[in-house]
């Protein structure tokens, strides 16, 4: 079979303006809850896209750890590529793709670091081996081989044991949404797209987009 011949005709659900909430965070919470109940694999996995000083984008999958009216929060190494790019250009795009429900959510906005207290609280809630990995890994930096990486981990484990201080270069980011789009697959590629845009007065406008 040719790659060009691979296609699915989506028919599970529809999405109308009257079905959606007045604000996108409430609507996202509804869809996220439905993804959980549908047992979608890792519904908290999202693509995070950033842009470097050279104007070139980069993307990776990250796990969201919280969301509320303040924004969408994840944690990472501030010295990683995404961290360095966000320091220079504090805007990002998030993408959730729940293929089992034929749904997608795109979120764009400005990104800020969360407080040190919030980062500390989450870091200490992680499994100890995850905390050790965060200390041992200089994320995005080259390394000779797997053995060298495991040696770094073993050294950190011997040094800290279960007492794992949060590294100063590790913490959270929160994206404050300015644009959110909900996509529902439909038959014949006539998909439903409902977009929310944040206005200067803090209110959200909502409109349907052509597929």
UniProtKB/Swiss-Prot annotation:
The protein's name in its UniProt record: Pyridoxine/pyridoxamine 5'-phosphate oxidase
Residues that coordinate or bind FMN: 60-65, 75-76, 81-82, 139-140, 183, 193
Gene: pdxH
Subunit (UniProt): Homodimer.
Pathway: Cofactor metabolism; pyridoxal 5'-phosphate salvage; pyridoxal 5'-phosphate from pyridoxamine 5'-phosphate: step 1/1; Cofactor metabolism; pyridoxal 5'-phosphate salvage; pyridoxal 5'-phosphate from pyridoxine 5'-phosphate: step 1/1
Superkingdom: Bacteria
One BP annotation, GO: pyridoxine biosynthetic process
Coiled-coil region(s): none
EC numbers on record: 1.4.3.5
Record key words, sorted: Flavoprotein, FMN, Oxidoreductase, Pyridoxine biosynthesis
Cofactor: FMN
CC cofactor note: Binds 1 FMN per subunit.
Role: Catalyzes the oxidation of either pyridoxine 5'-phosphate (PNP) or pyridoxamine 5'-phosphate (PMP) into pyridoxal 5'-phosphate (PLP).
GO terms, molecular function: FMN binding; pyridoxamine phosphate oxidase activity
Organism of this sequence: Herminiimonas arsenicoxydans
Residues binding substrate, per UniProt: 7-10, 65, 122, 126, 130, 189-191
Catalytic activity: pyridoxamine 5'-phosphate + O2 + H2O = pyridoxal 5'-phosphate + H2O2 + NH4(+); pyridoxine 5'-phosphate + O2 = pyridoxal 5'-phosphate + H2O2
PANTHER family on file: PYRIDOXINE-5'-PHOSPHATE OXIDASE (PTHR10851:SF0), PYRIDOXINE-5-PHOSPHATE OXIDASE (PTHR10851)
Membership in a protein family: Belongs to the pyridoxamine 5'-phosphate oxidase family.
């Amino acid at each position: 079979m040719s790659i060009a011949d691979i296609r699915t005709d989506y028919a599970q659900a529809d999405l109308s303006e009257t079905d959606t909430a007045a604000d996108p965070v409430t609507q996202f919470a509804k869809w996220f809850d439905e993804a959980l109940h549908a047992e979608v694999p890792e519904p908290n996995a999202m693509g995070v896209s950033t842009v470097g000083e050279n104007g070139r984008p980069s993307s990776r999958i990250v796990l969201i750890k919280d969301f509320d009216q303040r924004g969408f929060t994840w944690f990472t190494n501030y010295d990683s590529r995404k961290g360095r790019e966000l320091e220079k250009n504090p805007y990002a795009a998030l993408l959730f793709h729940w293929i089992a429900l034929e749904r997608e959510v795109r979120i764009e906005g400005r990104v800020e670091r969360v407080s040190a207290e919030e980062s500390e609280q989450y870091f200490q809630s992680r499994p100890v081996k995850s905390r050790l990995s965060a200390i041992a890994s200089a994320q995005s930096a080259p390394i000779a081989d797997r053995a060298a990486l495991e040696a770094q981990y073993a050294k950190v484990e011997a040094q800290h044991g279960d007492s794992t201080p949060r590294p100063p270069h590790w913490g959270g980011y929160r994206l404050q949404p300015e644009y959110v789009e909900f996509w529902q697959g439909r038959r014949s590629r006539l998909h439903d797209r409902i977009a929310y845009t944040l206005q200067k007065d803090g209110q959200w406008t909502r409109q349907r987009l052509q597929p």
